[in-house]
């Protein structure tokens, strides 16, 4: 099925690309999410008329994401306290939700799906580097300090 992308889609293309995808992927995911329209003559003409508007909207979201990434980086570090044993091993773990809540409490709005933990959940006290993906092209890093209660 031929579609026109209205947004950047990972492993598929960016705004304005005409791509061929399986019809189920287009009908059940891309079109309902507003990320694509089917490539009919009418839709192609309509898209070309609105292309500048859509590109401006995409640039605006990218600028907002870069501003959020700068705020995250400006925080420097976030401290989370958790119950731990004598050797610094936590009772339980610190996951994406805990980190997102701590960063949000520090003043930057983050949802848990934007937190990237490459080595899995945090299970020890100390300093840990955490990555955030606030946009498909924008990343940020933050130092999370876990202290024992």
Swiss-Prot record:
SUPFAM superfamilies: L9 N-domain-like (SSF55658), Ribosomal protein L9 C-domain (SSF55653)
Gene Ontology terms: biological process: translation
Keyword Ribonucleoprotein assigned: yes
Molecular-function annotations in GO: rRNA binding; structural constituent of ribosome
PROSITE patterns hit by this protein: RIBOSOMAL_L9 (PS00651)
Alphabetically ordered keywords of this record: Ribonucleoprotein, Ribosomal protein, RNA-binding, rRNA-binding
The keyword Metal-binding is annotated on this UniProt entry: no
GO cellular component, one term: ribosome
InterPro entries named in the record: Ribosomal_bL9, Ribosomal_bL9/RNase_H1_N, Ribosomal_bL9_bac/chp, Ribosomal_bL9_C, Ribosomal_bL9_C_sf, Ribosomal_bL9_N, Ribosomal_bL9_N_sf
PANTHER family in the record: 50S RIBOSOMAL PROTEIN L9 (PTHR21368)
Family according to the record: Belongs to the bacterial ribosomal protein bL9 family.
Function: Binds to the 23S rRNA.
Protein name (database record): Large ribosomal subunit protein bL9
Organism: Proteus mirabilis (strain HI4320)
């Amino acid at each position: 099925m031929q579609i026109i992308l209205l947004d950047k889609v990972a492993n598929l293309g960016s705004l304005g690309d005409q791509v061929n995808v399986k019809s189920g992927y287009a009908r059940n995911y891309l079109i309902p999410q507003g990320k694509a329209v089917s490539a009919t003559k009418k839709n192609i003409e309509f898209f070309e008329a609105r292309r500048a508007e859509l590109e401006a909207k995409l640039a605006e979201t990218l600028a907002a994401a870069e501003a959020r990434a700068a705020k995250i980086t400006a925080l420097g570090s976030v401290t989370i306290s958790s119950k731990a044993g004598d050797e610094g091993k936590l009772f339980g773990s610190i996951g994406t939700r805990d980190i997102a809540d701590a960063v949000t409490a520090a003043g930057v709005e983050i949802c848990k799906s934007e937190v990237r933990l490459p080595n899995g959940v945090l299970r020890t006290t100390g300093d840990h580097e955490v990555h955030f993906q606030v946009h498909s092209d924008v990343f940020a890093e933050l130092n999370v300090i876990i202290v024992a209660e």
